[in-house]
């Protein structure tokens, strides 16, 4: 009788063991972009020391990582925040979900000509990103700086139509996010991404008049997966290494300086 009662438990244990073995048999494949690659490389190296094999795949654009993940060519990607993910899902019908938080890259407002927002003249030009996700973040920054006022509650979905006050009559110019670094020389105020400013090595990434941060948690970069991968033990182990390894934290500090915050600590 006891033998019959315990058989289902044994069967479940064997099944779970087979599932775990199936996950562990292959290296974990992670897709990313250049801005996040170096700290991930440190995590891959640390994972190897702990017996977890990981393959890092670097993409040159922001579309392929989600296409590859959705098709199952990779197991997880790490390059996007929630607004970007939601926009991509709406546009392409991806079945993807956030798995765990990474870092938030502080985004700033930079000026080559002025040292404070008070110095901005009437009609000053302001360059922000032209895509729906990053332009909303730029407008939120301008509102935080006090140079414009937005309708209450619009958040990252803000557009220029949501500006209810613009006392300096700022001229907002929308340009491609990757071109914002170049706009620094011409515009009076520019939305800037420190990770890409550092890559371009064109001006001091720490020189922003204002940064955003964890008050906008929706911009924390996420480890993103397909829903069926949520119980993959390789994911849990790798994320734990990324979030808690001293070697990875040192790599993050070297790559981003003090221009990032740990999303899992906020």
Indicate where each model-derived feature is located.
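Short helix-initiation/N-cap motifs at beta->coil->alpha
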Residues: 56-67, 154-182
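Periplasmic-binding protein-like
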Residues: 134-143, 242-263
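A bilobed periplasmic-binding-protein/Venus flytrap-type ligand-binding module shared by bacterial periplasmic
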Residues: 106-117, 219-234
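Ligand-binding "clamshell"
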Residues: 87-99, 112-114, 186, 191, ...
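Pocket-flanking alpha-helical
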Residues: 62-94, 108, 115, 197-202
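A conserved helix-loop-strand patch within extracytoplasmic ligand-binding domains
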Residues: 99-149
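Short, well-ordered beta-strand elements
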Residues: 25-35, 52-58, 125-126
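Short, polar/charged alpha-helical segment
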Residues: 33-55, 64
């Amino acid at each position: 009788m006891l033998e019959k009662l315990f058989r289902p438990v044994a069967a479940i244990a064997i099944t779970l063991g087979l599932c775990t073995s199936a996950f562990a048999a292959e290296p974990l494949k992670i897709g990313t972009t250049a801005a996040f690659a170096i700290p991930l490389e440190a995590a891959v190296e640390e994972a190897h020391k702990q017996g977890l094999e990981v393959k890092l795949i670097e993409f040159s654009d922001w579309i392929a990582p989600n296409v590859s993940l959705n098709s199952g060519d990779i197991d997880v990607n790490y390059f996007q925040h929630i607004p970007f993910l939601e926009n991509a899902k709406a546009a392409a019908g991806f079945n993807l979900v956030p798995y765990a938080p990474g870092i938030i890259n502080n985004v700033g407002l930079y000026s080559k000509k002025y040292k404070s927002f008070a110095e901005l003249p009437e009609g000053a030009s302001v360059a922000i990103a032209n895509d729906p996700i990053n332009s909303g973040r730029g407008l939120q920054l301008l509102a935080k700086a006090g140079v414009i006022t937005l309708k209450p509650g619009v958040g990252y979905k803000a557009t220029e139509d949501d500006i209810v006050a613009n006392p300096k009559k700022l001229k907002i110019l929308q340009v491609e996010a990757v071109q914002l670094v170049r706009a620094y020389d011409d515009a009076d105020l520019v939305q800037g991404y420190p990770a890409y400013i550092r890559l371009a090595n064109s001006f001091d990434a720490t020189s922003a008049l204002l940064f955003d941060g964890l008050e906008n948690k929706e911009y924390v970069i996420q480890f993103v997966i397909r829903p069926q991968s949520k119980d993959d033990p390789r994911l849990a182990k790798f994320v734990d290494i990324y979030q808690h390894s001293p070697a990875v934290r040192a790599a993050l500090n070297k790559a981003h300086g003090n221009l990032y915050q740990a999303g899992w600590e906020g």
